[in-house]
Amino acid sequence: MMTEISVPLIFTDAAANKVKALISEEENPNLKLRVYITGGGCSGFQYGFTFDEKVNDGDLTIEKSGVHLVIDPMSLQYLIGGTVDYTEGLEGSRFVVNNPNASTTCGCGSSFSI
């Protein structure tokens, strides 16, 4: 019997599939999507996404569909219980974070406050 391990952040199929497509375009299977939090934006904190080849000590790695999402420990504390997704809409296509810890978010959804 397999046991379900609680993952502190959900990495959706849509996000994983887009990461897989982008990695394929770059022809570098070592790339991982890193999500991080920085100070700034209109609400105090903002989300960032970048591709990274390395995993640092203390980073959390979530695997889905053969690709990896990496989060540093400082950012993770603000993201616990959230969802990393990929959307296509009027604002264009982008990775987004749905964060239940955010008390307010800006209109574009890229910054938040606790």
UniProtKB/Swiss-Prot annotation:
GO MF term list: 2 iron, 2 sulfur cluster binding; 4 iron, 4 sulfur cluster binding; iron ion binding
SUPFAM superfamilies for the chain: HesB-like domain (SSF89360)
NCBIfam families reported in the protein's UniProt record: iron-sulfur cluster assembly accessory protein, PRK13623.1
Binding site for iron-sulfur cluster: C42, C106, C108
Cofactor: record remark: Binds 1 iron-sulfur cluster per subunit.
Keyword Amino-acid biosynthesis on entry: no
Subunit structure: Homodimer.
Record GO biological process: iron-sulfur cluster assembly
Name of the protein this chain belongs to: Iron-sulfur cluster insertion protein ErpA
Family note: Belongs to the HesB/IscA family.
UniProt superkingdom: Bacteria
Function: Required for insertion of 4Fe-4S clusters for at least IspG.
InterPro entries: FeS_biogenesis, FeS_cluster_insertion, FeS_cluster_insertion_CS, FeS_cluster_insertion_RrpA, HesB-like_dom_sf
Keywords in alphabetical order: Iron, Iron-sulfur, Metal-binding
Any Pfam family hit: Fe-S_biosyn
